[in-house]
Amino acid sequence: MYAIVKNGGKQYKVQEGDIVLFDKMSLEPKSKVELNEVLALCKDDNLILGTPFVEGAKIEIEVINEDRAKKVVTFKKRRRKDSKTKRGFRRDFTRVRILKIAA
């Protein structure tokens, strides 16, 4: 059984027991939250698509921790002009465990 869930403008394919990195949610570690924005649900080769969400479907998650990803560096150099730009970016994320998918 798996589900497609919407969180922070992105879509994630999740199964029970998975550990997923969502965008920062500002929640306490060990807290449990229910997500109601389930776009699709598949169990026993039976696919249920929502319009836009599946009615009555919930996903229970447990927050593990909040962290920051490794730095992604972008570097641009223009040849023969002594011009260059270097920027770094670190994404904030929340690591969660999928406890239960209920339909």
From Swiss-Prot:
GO BP term, example: translation
GO molecular function: rRNA binding; structural constituent of ribosome
Domain of life: Bacteria
Cited InterPro entries: bL21-like, bL21-like_sf, Ribosomal_bL21, Ribosomal_bL21_CS
One GO CC term, this protein: ribosome
Leader sequence residues: none
Pfam families found in the cross-reference section: Ribosomal_L21p
PROSITE patterns: RIBOSOMAL_L21
Entry keyword set: Ribonucleoprotein, Ribosomal protein, RNA-binding, rRNA-binding
Quaternary structure annotation from Swiss-Prot or TrEMBL: Part of the 50S ribosomal subunit. Contacts protein L20.
HAMAP family: Ribosomal_bL21
Function: This protein binds to 23S rRNA in the presence of protein L20.
Family label: Belongs to the bacterial ribosomal protein bL21 family.
Name the record gives this protein: Large ribosomal subunit protein bL21
Source species of the chain: Wolinella succinogenes (strain ATCC 29543 / DSM 1740 / CCUG 13145 / JCM 31913 / LMG 7466 / NCTC 11488 / FDC 602W) (Vibrio succinogenes)
Gene this protein is translated from: rplU
